[in-house]
Amino acid sequence: MGFDIENTYVLRFERMTSKAAAYQPGRTMKEDVADLHEIVNRLAHRPDVEAVSLSQNCIPYNDGANSFSFYLDTVPVRSLKRWITPEYFNVFRYRNIDGSGSESLAEALTPSGMVLSVNIADVYQDAPWHGKELLGRRVPVWRNEPEAEHLSIAALTEPVRYDHFTAPDDYGSRYAAVYLTDEALESLGETVYIEVCLRVREGQNDGFIDRLIVDADRQYQVGNLYLLDITPLSDVRTAYETDSVNELNTQFCIIFFLLLNIFLGIIGTFWFRTQHRRAEIALRMALGSTLGNLRSSDGGRSLVIADICYSCIGCGVEFGICRTGGSYTYAFYGRSFLRLRFWALLF
């Protein structure tokens, strides 16, 4: 997948209403952002927390995403946008292509330097640079003009799949990580749109939510902000992939039902029908048919049925593999010779 969500959580903080007893009137979004940084700092100092990050609309298995574009010479490159603080790489353990791990990625992400997935330009054949050649390039973002903002490509990560049902080369695996500044946070208008992600240390995951909630009112209510909810990323993944999993299970049930009917058909043809045709076979031999002729006749039927069976099995296996790999449309409707052969046999 290119990331690790084990022992990770996403927290959201909301602003109190004026009816709350602890509400402080007159506080601005800038002050709310400062309060949120204080909360993040307190979370990071918990002995059971390994790393804490801020992000906007880019947690794994998110139902939405931000877009981004920059230029390689004159070629526009479009991808997903990871709007994050550096610790995001440590929370989800992204991997640097040079093998140095997530710490080097966190150090590379700055307001003037972005981090890209190594495959971000692979689909752009006209691009002058690909893969490792992108490192160190300074490129214009959004507009290919001299006065446009320019960012340096400071590091490259391994490709990151969007979920288990998209291919590694899908659009969702190509992203640009851009530094999430305080000005950008303030522009969101509400802290509820900001994701606070954290990783719990090994062996500390059991009961973590209960321990955090106990401390929430005392330590993590700052200014007008309070902890709205905390969700394990494993639950986010389950909710996001439920429809795809259900669809896949339905397809497997259909394939199983089809194969079961084929199996029963084979049993009926090769066993019961043969038993009922013993008198016919004896009559044909009495009229001059040889064993070779009988074998050819029955063998032809066997080959047709076996061909149908193996074609169905091949289609089912290919369908399952391609569906989970993310290339359902191309494979199932364009590439499947076995499927075409199966329908030709039926009609």
Model-derived segments and spans:
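C-terminal membrane-exit region of the final transmembrane helix in multipass inner-membrane proteins
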Residues: M1, F270, H276, R339-F347
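N-terminal signal-anchor/signal peptide hydrophobic helix marking the start
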Residues: M1, T250-C253, R301-L303
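Membrane-proximal extracellular/periplasmic loop immediately following the first transmembrane helix
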Residues: G2-V77, K81-R82
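Mid-to-C-terminal secondary-structure elements
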Residues: H45-A51, S55-A239
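Membrane-helix entry/capping segments
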Residues: R218-I255, H276, I321-R341
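Selective detector of the "anchor" transmembrane alpha-helix that sits immediately C-terminal
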Residues: T250-W271
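Intracellular coupling helices
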Residues: L264-V304
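Small-residue-rich transmembrane alpha-helices
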Residues: R301-F347
